[in-house]
Design a protein with these regions (language model features):
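Active-site glycine-centered loops adjacent to acidic/histidine catalytic or metal-binding residues
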Residues: 36, 68-69, 96-97, 173, ...
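Hydrophobic beta-strand anchors of alpha/beta hydrolase catalytic cores
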Residues: 31, 64, 129, 168-169
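N-terminal active-site segment of His-dependent metallophosphoesterases
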Residues: 19-79
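Extended active-site neighborhood of metal-dependent phosphoesterases/phosphodiesterases
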Residues: 75-163, 191-211, 221, 225-236, ...
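Short acidic, glycine-rich surface-loop motifs adjacent to enzyme active sites
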Residues: 159-181
């Protein structure tokens, strides 16, 4: 695997060297990204996180980020956070809906990650990165998992966008794009149209500080779509695709199945999935993904609805996405 990673790094370098020849002043940033590790679900989470961190130490991104549903704050998971924190460069978390499982409060989830707020921003390599939280309450009596960005957060978002002269990249757990689902289900946040309108209005008024792309997890899909000049990219889970109890299938030993009771309702990926993303203001988003295979039968062999077959797969696709070049001079 190490040789494959080194080859991909070399190829990426050649691509971006070609891009920069047209504009030596182009801004570039390199990101290591993963999503939906789901520590409580998988029996081999330590191996998966270690593989990601080891790969990132070779790839040397400017920072790493996980897009939520990492794990709840329990002592038995501290060792996984220690592995994450062993990466010798900046590292960031996004709060997913499962971070509050088991009655965990948002405050406790944040404290466990040494985070001050569930939404925040940072600057790196001439870009502004905005991390959003899709777990706001849509109404005061709302129960269960949430998928909404409230008024206070969106006011903060507008202020963040108005305060920068740098191109913008957005991260969230729940999606802001269309992210297709089974008919009757909605996978993006409830007010995704409202948030996209904020993005698009900002881009109409700003040429240098345009929003380039938004990355999310949550659905365990492999998906990318350009909506009105902004790329919305769903990063697949590091670990599995969730099927549900009606597709129960025991894929590991009896001991594993007994201790990790949710695995039988998933289609696990044999290898951990993650990606390296490189963004250049020359107008290129380069995603170097990974492919694996299912442990046991695929969702389709178990009768899972086939309308999602295009997006449900044991992979994060490698992609070359283009956007209008940003003139930073």
């Amino acid at each position: 695997m190490k040789n494959i990673i080194l080859l991909l790094i070399a190829v990426t370098g050649l691509i971006f060297q070609g891009c920069s020849s047209a504009n030596e002043e182009a801004k570039k940033v390199k990101i290591g990204i993963c999503s939906d590790v789901h520590l409580p679900t998988m029996h081999d989470s330590e191996k998966r996180i270690t593989a990601f961190i080891d790969s990132m130490k070779i790839a040397k991104p400017d920072f790493i980020i996980e897009l939520g549903d990492f794990g709840i704050p329990k002592k038995e998971y501290l060792k996984y956070f220690d592995i994450w924190n062993s990466f010798p460069a900046p590292k960031y978390h996004v709060i997913g809906n499962h971070e509050m499982d088991g009655g965990t409060s948002m405050e406790k989830a944040l404290t466990f990650r040494e985070m001050k707020k569930s939404y925040y921003s940072f600057e790196m390599k001439g870009f502004r990165f905005i991390v959003l939280d899709g777990n706001d309450k849509q109404n005061s009596d709302e129960k269960g998992y949430r998928s909404y960005m409230g008024k206070k957060q969106l006011t903060w978002l507008r202020n963040e966008l108005n305060s920068t002269n740098n191109p913008v990249v957005v991260f969230s757990h729940q999606g802001i794009g269309h992210d297709p689902g089974i008919p009757g289900e909605r996978y993006s946040i409830a007010n995704s149209k409202e948030v996209r309108k904020i993005f698009e209005e900002h881009n109409r008024k700003n040429k240098k500080a345009r929003i380039i792309c938004c990355f999310n997890g949550h659905t365990h899909h492999d998906y990318a779509e350009d909506i009105n000049g902004i790329w919305y990219v769903t990063i697949n889970s590091m670990s599995y695709y969730w099927l549900g109890e009606e597709y129960e299938h025991i894929r590991y030993s009896a001991d594993v199945d007994k201790e990790f009771k949710w695995i039988k309702y998933t289609a696990p990926y044999r290898d951990p999935l993650f990606a390296v993303v490189e963004i250049s203001t020359d107008g290129v988003i380069k995603i170097i993904g990974k492919s694996s295979e299912y442990v046991g039968p695929s969702p389709w062999e178990l009768g899972y609805p086939e309308q999602l077959k295009k997006y449900v797969a044991p992979r994060i696709s490698s992609r070359l996405l283009e956007f209008n070049k940003i003139n930073i001079n």
